[in-house]
Every structure is written in C-alpha cells, then in structure tokens.
C-alpha cells in the first residue's frame, strides 16, 4: 500500500512540475514557424518572456538584412523572443525589387504574419510605400491602439502608399502626427553625404542614450520638419544629424547644412485611450547598423518602450552575431546584388 502511495505521489509531483514548467514557459514564443517569416527564441536575459515583432519591408535601405540581424542581437544577447516579417512576392520570396507603389493600381504588397502584431510586446518597423490590403493594414491599426511601444526606423514615416486610413475620433491620422515627423526631402546629399549623430546635450541622460558614444551612418539626413510643420512640442529630440561632405566616416561636416533632428521620442494615444511610447529614428540603413551606436540606441529603445529602463546597461552586448555584410542602399539592384531570395536566406 505504501508503495502505491509513493507511486501516486511521484506521479502527482511530476504532473505538478510539468504544469508549473508549462506555466513558466507559457510566455515563450507563441508564433508558429513558417517559411514566410523568421522566429528567434530568446535565451535567458532581461527580455525573457517578451515578444518583439520586427518588420522589414523597404526597397532601398536593405532592411531585409538589418532587421534579422537586430532580431539575433535582441534574442541572443538580451533574451527577447523575436519574429521577423518581410514583404514577399507571389512566390513567397523576400523581394526588395518589387515596385512601390505598383503601376497597376489594383495590385497590393504582402507582408505575411502581420497577425502576430497582436502577440507583440514591442514592434520595430521599417517599411517604405507599402500598398497593403486593408485586412493587413488593420493589424497595424489595432497595434496603434494597443498602448504598446513602437520603434519606427528610417522610411517608416512614409511607410504606406497613400497614407493611413487610420482614424481617431472620426479624424484621419497621419504618420506625421503619430510619429512626430515625416519625410519632406533629403537635407543631406542623397547617397552622397553621410550622417554624424550629435547628442542633444539637454537630453543626454535619456535612457535610450545609455552607453551610446559614436553615431555615424551612410544614410543622409532627412528633413522631417519646416516652418509650417515645426518640430512638435510633444517630441523630445535626442540626436541631431549633421550632414558630412561625403560618405566617409572621418569626413568633415558640410558647414552649409545645419544639423536636424534624426532621433526623437514621443507618446501616442490611440482609440482605446492607451498610451504608447514612440521612438522614431530616421537613420537605419543596413550599413548604418554596422555602427555600434546605431544598434545600441535601437536596442535601448526596446527597453525604454517596455518600461525596462533600469535593465539598460552601458556595457551590454550589441555585438553582431555571425556574418553581416550589408549591401549598399539604392535602387540599382543588379549592380548592388539585390534580388529576390527565400526567407531562410536571411536566417
């Protein structure tokens, strides 16, 4: 009899242990693997149990390379579960060569897996002139109402063709209003003048800037504001971008061009009255992300957006994992080596 009791006790303990393990692991990546997106399970770290969805959907700045690299950094060095979504062609290939917008006004782009935005704790987003079907756009609109953080890189401020059909209080909301600025032209020479980041001294203690030193990239400075649309009062500028005279890292500044805001924070409140933290960084080409400062700011922004500022360490690793040989930005695809590739190519 005692032996039977011991056996039942053992079975009960095992069942309880497994149930507890399942509970503790319930926050693990709840996104099914697919040949249309990438998934990275986080290791043990501050981000354990948090899910970051990253979107790569542009045609110029090689986000199909930089975004998976960021996902590896976040998952392997910081413990975040990550899902990477891409714009794909009719064959299911990542295809930066597709026109944006299409000449055929009936055609639409496709970003499979946007339903996973509903499971995201944070979104990192880089798209350019995506013309998506309304059911895919709805996933964005729902996220904009979620109160969760949004990190918008480079061309995200003109990320959708024709603007948003997102409304708040019966009013159409623009990306300018949501992100705090939108592309109004190339202040720096397009593909000719690199950018040197200059920390705004009044805001140098902001958590996103912890451990950030050198900031440089080959993408030019965007003009996102003018006299009619000045830098918003509800935004906090963190970095000014100084155009350089060429694309070399040690190039002197172009003194004929003033530095303009390239990184700022703000808050956004959607239709549910929930407040989101927003970080907009108008640098962000794949080559820019070779720079440690650019990577660290983006990683720090995830922590900041999630209210995890105390977990930001100035010496935490943002080292690139594996080979990272980003192609240059531009539209001369054959010369640059850009072509449609299977999703797994970017794993």
Residue ranges and their predicted role:
Residues 38, 53-55, 59-159:
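Helical hinge/lid and interdomain linker segments adjacent to catalytic or ligand-binding clefts
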Residues 1-6:
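Positively charged n-region of N-terminal signal peptides that target proteins for export
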Residues 29-37, 75, 81, 108, ...:
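Catalytic beta-strand/loop cores that center a nucleophilic Ser/Cys/Thr
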Residues 25-47, 66, 76, 92, ...:
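Extracellular ligand-binding/catalytic regions of CAZymes and related secreted enzymes
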Residues 7-19:
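Bacterial N-terminal signal peptides
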Residues 116, 125, 129-211:
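A glycine-rich, often tryptophan-bearing local segment used as a flexible ligand/cofactor-contacting loop or short
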Residues 50:
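Nucleotide donor/acceptor-binding cores
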Residues 57-60, 128, 191-197, 213, ...:
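Active-site rim elements
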């Amino acid at each position: 009899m005692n032996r039977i009791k011991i056996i039942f006790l053992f079975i009960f303990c095992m069942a309880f242990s497994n149930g507890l393990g399942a509970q503790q692991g319930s926050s693990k990546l709840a996104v099914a693997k697919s040949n249309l997106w990438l998934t990275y399970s986080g290791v043990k770290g501050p981000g354990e149990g948090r899910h970051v969805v990253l979107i790569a959907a542009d045609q110029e700045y090689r986000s199909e390379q930089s975004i998976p690299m960021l996902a590896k950094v976040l998952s392997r060095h910081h413990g975040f579960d990550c899902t990477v979504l891409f714009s794909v062609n009719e064959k299911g290939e990542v295809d930066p060569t597709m026109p944006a917008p299409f000449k055929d006004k009936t055609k639409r782009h496709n970003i499979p897996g946007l339903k996973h935005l509903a499971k995201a704790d944070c979104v990192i987003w880089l798209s350019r002139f995506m013309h998506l079907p309304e059911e895919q756009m709805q996933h964005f609109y729902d996220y904009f109402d979620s109160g969760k953080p949004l990190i918008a890189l480079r061309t995200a401020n003109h990320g959708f063709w024709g603007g948003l059909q997102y409304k708040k209080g019966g009013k159409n909301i623009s990306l300018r209003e949501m992100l705090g600025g939108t592309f109004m032209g190339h202040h720096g020479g397009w593909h000719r003048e690199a950018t040197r980041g200059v920390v705004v001294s009044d805001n140098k203690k902001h958590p996103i800037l912890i451990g950030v030193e050198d900031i440089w990239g080959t993408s030019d400075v965007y003009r996102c504001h003018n006299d009619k649309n000045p830098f918003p009062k509800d935004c906090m500028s963190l970095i000014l971008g100084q155009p350089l005279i060429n694309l070399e890292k040690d190039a002197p500044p172009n003194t004929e061009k003033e530095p303009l805001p390239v990184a700022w924070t703000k808050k956004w409140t959607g239709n549910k009255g929930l407040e989101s933290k927003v970080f907009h960084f108008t640098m962000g080409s794949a080559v820019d992300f070779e720079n440690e400062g650019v990577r660290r700011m983006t990683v720090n922004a995830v922590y900041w957006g999630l209210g995890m500022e105390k977990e930001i360490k100035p010496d935490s690793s943002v080292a690139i994992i594996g080979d990272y040989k980003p192609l240059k930005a531009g539209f001369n695809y054959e010369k640059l080596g850009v072509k449609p590739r299977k999703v797994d190519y970017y794993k």
